[in-house]
């Protein structure tokens, strides 16, 4: 059972960006909107992100960096932070997953898991 002081829940919605994609060049653009909810008992700051992006051919790309879209938000208990970003893949389908490193008000660092989610061109999956 995880510690109730450090409970971060992450949800993601995705969208295929046809206007920014170039299928003839194997470039498929997607946006994703992430909502990070602090269901814990302590305020927590998002320090960094770690994404694992796997395309439909099994190629894996890892992305690490400080914060999200230039921010390191402080999220109070019961509050949330939402942001949008994007990625380009060489295939019509792929999966993203990862984690955020968080810093609780009491100084404890912990990871918030980002469960795998699918990126797919509409109609690409049957």
Swiss-Prot record:
Pfam families: DUF525. Residues 2-126 form the ApaG domain. It comes from the Bacteria. GO terms for biological process: error-free translesion synthesis. HAMAP family: ApaG. This is Protein ApaG. It comes from Ectopseudomonas mendocina (strain ymp) (Pseudomonas mendocina).
């Amino acid at each position: 059972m995880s510690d109730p002081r450090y409970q971060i829940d992450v949800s993601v919605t995705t969208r295929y960006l046809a206007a920014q994609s170039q299928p003839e060049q194997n470039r498929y653009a997607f946006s994703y909107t992430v909502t990070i909810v602090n269901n814990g008992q302590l305020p927590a700051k998002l320090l960094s992100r770690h994404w694992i992006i796997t395309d439909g051919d099994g190629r894996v790309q890892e992305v690490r960096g400080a914060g999200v879209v230039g921010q390191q938000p402080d999220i109070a208990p019961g509050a949330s932070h939402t942001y949008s970003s994007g990625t380009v893949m060489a295939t019509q389908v792929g999966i993203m997953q990862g984690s955020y490193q968080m810093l609780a008000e009491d100084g404890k660092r912990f990871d918030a898991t980002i469960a795998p989610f699918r990126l797919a061109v509409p109609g690409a999956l049957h």
